[in-house]
Amino acid sequence: MIIVLGIRTDLALEARELYKEREIPGVSIREEGEEGIKITRVKILDERGEKAMGKPVGDYITIEAPGLLERDLDLEERVAKVLANIISELAQLKKDSHVLVVGLGNWNVTPDALGPRVVSNIVVTRHLKEYAPLQFGDEIRSVSAFSPGVLGITGIETAEILKGVVDRVKPDLVITIDALASRRLERLSTTIQISNTGISPGSGVGNRRLSITSESLGVPVIAIGVPTVVDAVTIAHDTIEYLVKELSEQTSKESVFYKVLENMNKQEKYSLIEEVLSPYVQNLVVTPKEIDLLIKNIALVISRGINLALQPGLTEKEMNQLLH
């Protein structure tokens, strides 16, 4: 997670945006897309990039589709297919690979329930491959899935639970899904980040737990995240920035008021935010009132994308039969 003067974001794309148009040593960026969908590929190449971005070396691919807020079924299907292609690209799976899908988060808290919602719509087949191999043959890939809950529910670190499961079922790949924090309201539930560097559960709300990475689990990890909350500090900061800009443009450059605005540095702005939001300055997040519907819709898009990537040999009808 990037934290600059209290402003938090889990998106590598937004960490890159903090540097405006400047080149960042050790970081490459490439943009592509199609109608209604923008894909940004941020690649952190070395330690210089790690230090600048606050994230480990690896690939961070972001899918932005603002139209997802409108419940556009055609767009949802296209986003799911883009997601499937990116997962396939990063995973490089073999036909006999076993994949474990993990829904991180607290199913009792709507903005944090993305992972469990996605897992409930994953086509799980490990038991079918094991107990009915002749019936299902080679057209399906072995997939298992579960939601481990959170430390406050289980009393056990999520990474510890996951490590135990990985050691037991021995997957070739782990895919995690978690809710993230963004610094822009328009990215909530319309942006999907996919990375091959793992994740720290709870980091989206500043509640960092043990990391889930290829190093800690011993198998490759692909992390999928969607921002569902924005830091209140971020909203306050952006409001002050906009207010200062507007007042500066409408005030004579010779006036004392203009000079006060012009000389107001970032630390002074943040001190003002702290005073207003105290005592919750680091613990207050904002989410849309329709978050229930947004989580439901984006969870279906992500689960569809994962199913397409992991089960390319199944038709939609066959997937639905295995789901329900």
Swiss-Prot record:
Protein family membership:
Belongs to the peptidase A25 family.
Q: Does the keyword Protease apply?
A: yes
Q: Which Pfam families match?
A: Peptidase_A25 (PF03418)
Catalytic reactions of this protein: Endopeptidase action with P4 Glu or Asp, P1 preferably Glu > Asp, P1' hydrophobic and P2' Ala
Cross-referenced SUPFAM superfamilies, in alphabetical order? Answer: HybD-like
Its subunit composition reads: Homotetramer.
Propeptide intervals in chain numbering: 1-10
- Going by the record, the broad EC class of this enzyme is hydrolase
- Keyword rRNA processing among UniProt keywords: no
Lineage of the native species? Bacteria, Bacillati, Bacillota, Clostridia, Thermoanaerobacterales
Q: What is this protein called?
A: Germination protease
Keyword terms, alphabetized: Hydrolase, Protease, Zymogen
User: Per the UniProt record, which EC number(s) apply here?
Assistant: 3.4.24.78
Q: What does this protein do?
A: Initiates the rapid degradation of small, acid-soluble proteins during spore germination.
Summarize what the UniProt record says about post-translational modification.
Autoproteolytically processed. The inactive tetrameric zymogen termed p46 autoprocesses to a smaller form termed p41, which is active only during spore germination.
Which GO terms fall under molecular function for this chain's record?
metalloendopeptidase activity
Q: Any one Gene Ontology biological process term? A: spore germination
